Amino acid sequence: TLRVADKTVSGEGFSVSFDPKSGFIRSYRLRNVELLAGPLRPSFYRAATDNDLGVRQTGKYPDSRMWAGAEPELVNFTLTSGDGGAKAVADYTIPAVGAQLRLAYVIAADGSIRIGETMTADSARKDVADLMRFGMAFETPGMFDAVEYYGRGPMENYADRSGAAFVGRYAQRVADQFHMKYVSPQESGTRSGLRWWRLTDASGFGIEFCSDRHFSASAIPYAIPQLDNGSSEYVRHPGDLVPDGRTHVNIESVQSGLGCVNSWGRLPRPEYLLPYGDYSFNFLLQPVTGGR
C-alpha cells in the first residue's frame, strides 16, 4: 500500500520525496538507506571535449554552454495516488532556450519509478545551440561504486565511436570509468547501447535503469564543473582532480557524437548531432536489494 503525504510517497521499505520548489526527486530511500546525494534532474550538457572546444572557438555556431545554464523553472506540480500507483507530473519552462519540459513519474508499490521526460522546443527560436545530451543526472553517496550493465564495452564509447565496443555484460568500478589519460579533463566514461545499467555498493544494493530503447549512462567520481568551468582556457590535468566523495551519474536517451574528425572546428557528422527540437526519454528506475 502506498501512502502520499507532503510530497512524499512511501511504501513497503522505501520512500520517494519531491522538492517543493523544483519538483525534482530529492530523496529516494530504500531499506532506510538514502540513495541520492543530489536531486534527480534534467541534463542537457556535458563537460566539453577537446573537439567541442575546437568547434566553440570557431564562433560559427551557437554556444553549447547555453545548455549548461538552461535551468528549468517549475510552473505546476501535481501528486496523486490511485490503483496504478502514485503519479506525479511537473511542468516547467526553460527560459534560456525557450522550451517547455514535462517530467512524469509513476511510483509503484515495489519502489520502482517509471519516468518520462519530454521537451517541446520553440520552433521560432533559431539562436539555440545543439544539445550535448538529453537525459537526467543525479549524485549518489560514494559507497555506490560498482557498475554493471548489458551494453557496449568494456571501454567508454559514444554514438560515433563504438565500433570496437562489443555488446556484452560488464562489471566495473566507478573509479575506473573516467579515462585518466586525456591531457585535460573532459567528458568521459559514457557507455552506450545499454539494455540495462545498474549502480550498487559492494553488497549489490542499489538501483537499476532500463528503457524501451537503447540508452547511455555514466558514473564517475567528478562533477561536470570540475571538468569544465565554461572557459576554453580551462586546462588542468586529470591527475589534479580530487573526487568529491560522491558518484556522479548521467543517464540519457541520446548524447552528441564526439566528432573525432579534427579538433579545430569540425562538427560530428549530422546523424550524430542533437539539433534543438523536441525530445523524449522514458525509462524505469528500480531498486536492487542485493544482499540486504
PLM regions with names:
Residues T1-R292:
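Beta-strand/loop-rich accessory regions of lumenal/periplasmic or secreted enzymes
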